[in-house]
Regions:
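Exposed beta-strand and adjacent loop surfaces of beta-rich binding modules
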Residues: 111
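Extended, subdomain-level signal for the structured scaffold at the beginning of enzyme domains
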Residues: 1-89, 93, 102-108, 121-163
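Catalytic nucleophile serine of serine hydrolases
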Residues: 97
Length: 163
């Protein structure tokens, strides 16, 4: 799970992580720093790894957590490259809230059904996605969610893609 160094959306990290752990999956938390990351509502997380050190051998699913801080990855060639490599290597690639903008800017949503927090709709459309506005969308190993209320369903859809 990739979180922003600050202002990630707490429940979009905590709820999927809880679902993944409850279902026997290991969770690695990555960020752009190894210093403590603080969510919008005060959740403190010390990342396990700098996202720049991640390789697709480290995970089966890549999850970009939303919240305003996720914008630090919007134009990150490293984040885009990681997402593209994960997809090419058959991994599940996912993002929630505003974070699907990262996948769009990486070119992964071209011709795909996707959703996003309403502020990101235009970015998805510019990237060639078919924006649905649904809480969660799945299209060919790419899972997108539109915000915190969808966090648990989003996690379940990510896990379904792992089967």
């Amino acid at each position: 799970m990739v979180i922003a160094k600050s202002n990630f959306r707490d429940e979009e990290y905590l709820h999927p992580k809880e679902e993944f752990l409850r279902n026997g999956h290991e969770v690695i938390t990555a960020s752009s720093t190894l210093k403590e990351s603080i969510g919008r509502f005060g959740t403190k997380v010390t990342p396990d790894i700098d996202y720049k050190e991640l390789t697709t051998d480290d995970f089966d699913a890549l999850v970009f957590v939303g919240g305003g801080g996720a914008s630090e990855y919007f134009d990150s060639s490293l984040a885009h490259g990681l997402a593209r490599e994960a997809y090419r290597n058959g991994k599940v690639v996912s993002a929630i809230c505003i974070a699907p903008v990262i996948l769009s800017k990486a070119g992964l949503l071209q011709g795909k059904k996707a959703t996003v927090f309403p502020d990101g709709e235009n970015d998805l459309i510019k990237g060639g996605a078919f924006y649905t506005g649904n809480p969660v969308e799945v299209d060919d190993r790419i899972v997108t969610g539109n915000g915190p209320d969808a966090a648990r369903d989003f996690a379940k859809k990510v896990m379904e893609q792992l089967k």
